[in-house]
Swiss-Prot record:
Function: Component of SEC61 channel-forming translocon complex that mediates transport of signal peptide-containing precursor polypeptides across the endoplasmic reticulum (ER). Forms a ribosome receptor and a gated pore in the ER membrane, both functions required for cotranslational translocation of nascent polypeptides.
Topology, Cytoplasmic side: 1-32, 97-117, 166-172, 262-288, 375-420, 463-476
Family designation: Belongs to the SecY/SEC61-alpha family.
Pfam family of the protein (one): SecY
Sorted UniProt keywords: Endoplasmic reticulum, Membrane, Protein transport, Translocation, Transmembrane, Transmembrane helix, Transport
Protein's recorded name: Protein transport protein Sec61 subunit alpha isoform 2
Membrane topology (UniProt): Multi-pass membrane protein
Organism from which the protein derives: Pongo abelii
Compartment annotation: Endoplasmic reticulum membrane
Superkingdom per UniProt: Eukaryota
Intervals, Lumenal compartment: 54-75, 139-144, 194-240, 310-353
Amino acid sequence: MGIKFLEVIKPFCAVLPEIQKPERKIQFREKVLWTAITLFIFLVCCQIPLFGIMSSDSADPFYWMRVILASNRGTLMELGISPIVTSGLIMQLLAGAKIIEVGDTPKDRALFNGAQKLFGMIITIGQAIVYVMTGMYGDPAEMGAGICLLIIIQLFVAGLIVLLLDELLQKGYGLGSGISLFIATNICETIVWKASSPTTINTGRGTEFEGAVIALFHLLATRTDKVRALREAFYRQNLPNLMNLIATVFVFAVVIYFQGFRVDLPIKSARYRGQYSSYPIKLFYTSNIPIILQSALVSNLYVISQMLSVRFSGNFLVNLLGQWADVSGGGPARSYPVGGLCYYLSPPESMGAILEDPVHVVVYIIFMLGSCAFFSKTWIEVSGSSAKDVAKQLKEQQMVMRGHRDTSMVHELNRYIPTAAAFGGLCIGALSVLADFLGAIGSGTGILLAVTIIYQYFEIFVKEQAEVGGMGALFF
């Protein structure tokens, strides 16, 4: 059934726009150039407003997810990477549940990637329609069918651009992947802005700067009571404070520390005697994939809950899924879940909220740890990084594990890889929860994604440097 499903969608995949693989080795400086061009296009799209929208001043229902999904409200990047990640989530779950089967052949892998792209385009259209019809840009009846269709087309084209930019980097023209690049850029931009924003906001305590660092100097300069000014700068509510900034730096350091944890399995060449090496199995074996997929799951649950709340606000089942309230609190207006399933799957707003509702905290922790471990464990089966796949790669390189025959390598790798994947996912979830509770800027999930992505780029840089033999050879 699985192979038949992939064969059924094969004709549709053939007509999808595709980036061809490079016919020659792309030099590092060219990769840097293509990566910079990709990032520039993304940032430009983040600033171009959607044509035809009547209003985007209402409370933002996806405010809490925008940093993670690299989206920007009211612009071409309204959907961000959500369609790509959601399609990956769906395909992974289908493959993990054996509803579709993905073989080891390049043909099956190509069909699987094509199916993921096809679903990504379908989801883009679906999300665009939902956003327009739920009144995010104004009353659809007042805007008219023509304007509604125009907004949907703009969102679809922007979604297609994101898909192609991601594929451009994935095919080897650039560094890393588009998804990782866009997420890291968005999160780092948010952290820098929250730390140094010159925007002034009128609070009950008077006019204050949004940026935590600028606010420190402003409060010290304008307040007569310097001790109270310091206290406000470190602990002020509803705006970024210095404790948030310190928590962010602390989480950065902790994640980088854990990146170095790994188990090295001794391997040797089957052809040349005396040639020894090691195969590293990292603690974060699946890197940031679990948290990306978990974010996609939650964001889509938010979309469904918001859509139903707008239309059927008094329905018992809809309220069971999620109840929403608008919050301003000194920043942009946003919607936040205050009841139902969505409330329990979202992080507590503050330390006070943690003490007020411990059940919420317990459910949130269990959900984060469980979902990250599950996604990490199932991801290795569909991404070509399971024990069977690693054993096959080592065999192709004519390498074997010391003290083991070819036939027993899979069994030995199975002792480490699934455990590393599940435990690594669990640790990713735990670090995300810790960052949320400490109040890190950009959310725990966002910080975790930023650090792991930046570390990936550091590893790519080191690898490229080792291949060409020096820093100067990379660029000249």
